[in-house]
Amino acid sequence: PISGIGVSGFPRREERSYMPAFMVGLGQGQTLSHLMNVPLHIFAHQENHILAALRDLAHIPTDPFLALHLSGGTTELVYCHYQGEGIFESQIVGGSKDLQGGQYVDRIGVAMGLPFPAGKHLEALALQTTEYEPLPSSVKDGWISFAGPCSAAMRRISEAMSDTDKSNLARAVFTSIGNALEKMITYHTKEKPVRTLIAVGGVMSNSLLRKRMETYCKRSYLKLHVAQPQFSVDNATGNAFGAAYLQESRG
């Protein structure tokens, strides 16, 4: 039997954080909660992503941690401190100043003739090689710019590209993203020392970036928690885990 409902109500737990897309699910959750006479737990979209990564731990860290949110529409590094009741005090400390990580991937993939969204297709190309001509990575004061690397990658695309050229460029794109993420995280762990990094969002389902973050965190003595690939894309599992966790902790 259903004993509770978890739902996304807004993008972030901030004043004036609003997006019409969340109203549909919120309304459905409110209706079901009323009809079934069960509690409704409302989370921020960002909290859901974080909870999706924490579900395998079965508990929520009480110490502050960094959450890397990398998706088609978001590139953010968030300083988080759990306040209880499923609520995180959070502060965006880094991210991208222009293109988001997913946009960078999609623009290059589509320009190379791949279907949209291009992430999985570009990853498949990148996995065919370990060779590439490096692309730049731009990070200033803990903030990334993907526009420059994207422009540099675009200049390499032509109709005369061989399959090998395409694989090499795909590898270079993901390597440049990984380089930028490492620089950004390193900057902010010096500013706000933490022991845990949680990586969430659809782009984190990419095997190359996951491996890159695993290697980086091991080298940097950070505990890394990443939502399983199938849960990185769809954060509904975060809603479910958050609701179940709250009800269990409340008895």
Predicted regions span which residues?
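Conserved phosphate-binding/catalytic loops in two-lobed NTP-binding clefts
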Residues: 197, 214-239
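Adenine-nucleotide phosphate-binding core of ATP-dependent small-molecule kinases
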Residues: 141-147, 151-198
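Short beta-strand-loop/turn "lid" adjacent to the catalytic site in phosphate-handling enzymes
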Residues: 1-27
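Glycine-rich phosphate-binding loops at beta-strand->alpha-helix junctions
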Residues: 194-213
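A short helix-loop
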Residues: 61-63, 68-71, 76-164, 245, ...
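Short glycine-aspartate micro-motif
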Residues: 4-6, 21, 65-69, 198
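Glycine-rich phosphate-binding/hydrolytic loop that grips phosphoryl groups
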Residues: 49-52, 227-251
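Conserved phosphate-binding catalytic cores of ATP/NTP-utilizing and phosphoryl-transfer enzymes
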Residues: 38, 42-66, 241-243
